[in-house]
Structures are given as structure tokens and as C-alpha cells.
UniProtKB/Swiss-Prot annotation:
Involved in oxygen transport from the gills to various peripheral tissues. Signal peptide: none annotated. Heterotetramer of two alpha and two beta chains. Keywords: Heme, Iron, Metal-binding, Oxygen transport, Transport. Coiled coil: none annotated. Residues 2-146 form the Globin domain. Pfam families: Globin. One of its GO terms (molecular function) is oxygen carrier activity. Red blood cells. One of its GO terms (cellular component) is blood microparticle. Belongs to the globin family. The keyword Transport applies. This is Hemoglobin cathodic subunit beta.
Length: 146
């Protein structure tokens, strides 16, 4: 994937304003609420029985933050995302049997959370660049499936 300097600037600018401890848990909880079948991967996380339980679950919050911190590594290594996610892709495919479409769903949930957080500052251009970044991350996480 080729990244223009303006695209790199948009991605790094967005991430400079992201609080992983806030946005990550919101995105993961949104995924688990909107797509309840994804909860099957998180059986050890405790109570996932309601929206309130999901939003207040400390394990969901920690994992959401960790996922966002992993994405931050991708921001810092935009030219090498597939190699960066090689180990996580192998674990997600071979050990956890995660449906790769769930990565896209999580990326969509993250996009929604960012749009809500940034409002008008999350311009259509920013969203287009962000969606490109999400597609690269999803591709990196999905490469073990194909």
C-alpha cells in the first residue's frame, strides 16, 4: 500500500488525539453489543449479558485498550503492517478461529466511535484515509486465512 504524506499526516494526527483507554473500550463494547455472536471469543471476560454489563466490564475495557495500542503500533509502522501483525494473525486464525470479517466489524465500530468523538473535525477526507488504514490493518490480520 502506498501512503501519501497527507494520508500519513491524517492518520498520525487522528491518533495523536485518541485516548486508547477511552476509545478502545467503547469500540470493543460497541462490537459486542451490535454483533453479539462476537461475544463467543470473550467467554472468560465475565458478565456480557447486557449492554450495561458490557460497557462496565473491566476485561472488555482492558482488551479494547490493548487492541487500540496494537493499532498505534501500526500507525508507527504503516509501511510494514502485515509483518507487524503476523504473530497476531496466526493466533487469531489458527488458535482462536476468529472469523476475519469480525476485524472489519471492529474497524467499523472504531470508525463510529472516532466520528462521535471528533464530530465535524472527522471530515470526509479523514474518514476516507482512516478507512484505508483500517483496510490495511484488516488485511494484515486476515492474511493467515488465505
Amino acid at each position: 500500500v502506498q501512503w501519501s504524506s497527507s494520508e500519513r499526516s491524517v492518520i498520525s494526527g487522528l491518533w495523536a488525539k485518541v485516548n486508547a483507554a477511552e476509545v478502545g473500550p467503547q469500540a470493543l463494547a460497541r462490537l459486542l453489543v451490535l454483533y453479539p455472536w462476537t461475544q463467543r471469543y470473550f467467554g472468560k471476560f465475565g458478565d456480557l449479558s447486557s449492554n450495561a454489563a458490557l460497557m462496565g466490564n473491566a476485561n472488555v475495557a482492558k482488551h479494547g485498550k490493548d487492541l487500540l495500542l496494537a493499532d498505534l503500533k501500526a500507525v508507527k509502522n504503516m509501511d510494514n503492517v502485515k509483518a507487524l501483525y503476523a504473530k497476531x494473525x496466526x493466533x487469531x486464525x489458527x488458535e482462536l478461529n476468529v472469523d476475519p470479517d469480525n476485524f472489519t466489524l471492529l474497524g467499523d465500530c472504531l470508525t463510529i466511535v472516532l466520528a462521535m468523538k471528533f464530530g465535524a473535525d472527522f471530515t470526509p477526507v479523514d474518514q476516507a484515509v482512516w478507512q484505508k488504514f483500517v483496510a490495511v490493518v484488516v488485511s494484515g490480520l486476515s492474511k493467515q486465512y488465505f
